[in-house]
């Protein structure tokens, strides 16, 4: 997955996909009542980017639905995976479940069109705090209660806090999650981070008895870092510059080894070499 970072305005969906992304990451901020409110990051953010672009969350979902519904005039067939970076740091721990419920209702109505020919992209709910694992159950229970358990086939999970791999595994156990797990590792592009933990995550993915299905690395803007990530065997690279990553993927060392995922590839099944 070639993941466009911080895609928070509707017009940026086309911008990033046209540069080569087949996946986008979008920030979601919450109001005091745990309602998803805006697709907004705020200051500070990655170097070289505007931190202030935003939409109302429900409006963004409608724009995203247009971009991922075959037959729609705005349809982008390459866009197959969306990571919602859930900014739950503004919430109390005891609001996590409520945030999950409200998120499920919003997605069901505005993205999945109540199960009636909605958007087709796979969704990853990315949570920054292991203590907010009840968000997952709030989300999954709500989709079941609303009569759409089949949509959970389209949903995966990520804890994005760079926590110890063992601690993340425990949080998933508490949340009742087995499968559909993406593990992120990374840091803002303003700083450097070594590949130690991403290699650990890849090892867990490939061990056959780990909890991780896919690993992605963020935020990768330089060719050298891209090569390091591809050499480590990641499944996804998140970037501010999709065209840079696409260039590296076309280099002789990689063009026969890696390719962009298509809709037919499962985002939940670990790729066997």
From Swiss-Prot:
E.C. code: 4.6.1.-
Disulfide partners: 45-51, 47-190
Residues involved in Mg(2+) binding: 25, 27, 85
GO BP terms: killing of cells of another organism; lipid catabolic process
An example Gene Ontology molecular-function term: lyase activity
Textual note on the cofactor: Binds 1 Mg(2+) ion per subunit.
Catalytic residues in the record: 5, 41 (nucleophile)
Entry GO CC: extracellular region
Pfam families: GDPD_2
Main location per the UniProt record: secreted
InterPro entries the UniProt entry points to: PLC-like_Pdiesterase_TIM-brl (IPR017946)
Catalytic activity annotation: an N-(acyl)-sphingosylphosphocholine = an N-(acyl)-sphingosyl-1,3-cyclic phosphate + choline; an N-(acyl)-sphingosylphosphoethanolamine = an N-(acyl)-sphingosyl-1,3-cyclic phosphate + ethanolamine; a 1-acyl-sn-glycero-3-phosphocholine = a 1-acyl-sn-glycero-2,3-cyclic phosphate + choline; a 1-acyl-sn-glycero-3-phosphoethanolamine = a 1-acyl-sn-glycero-2,3-cyclic phosphate + ethanolamine
Subcellular location: Secreted
Known role: Dermonecrotic toxins cleave the phosphodiester linkage between the phosphate and headgroup of certain phospholipids (sphingolipid and lysolipid substrates), forming an alcohol (often choline) and a cyclic phosphate. This toxin acts on sphingomyelin (SM). It may also act on ceramide phosphoethanolamine (CPE), lysophosphatidylcholine (LPC) and lysophosphatidylethanolamine (LPE), but not on lysophosphatidylserine (LPS), and lysophosphatidylglycerol (LPG). It acts by transphosphatidylation, releasing exclusively cyclic phosphate products as second products.
UniProt record similarity statement: Belongs to the arthropod phospholipase D family. Class II subfamily.
Name this polypeptide is given: Dermonecrotic toxin LhSicTox-alphaIA2aii
Species the sequence originates in: Loxosceles hirsuta (Recluse spider)
Organismal lineage: Eukaryota, Metazoa, Ecdysozoa, Arthropoda, Chelicerata
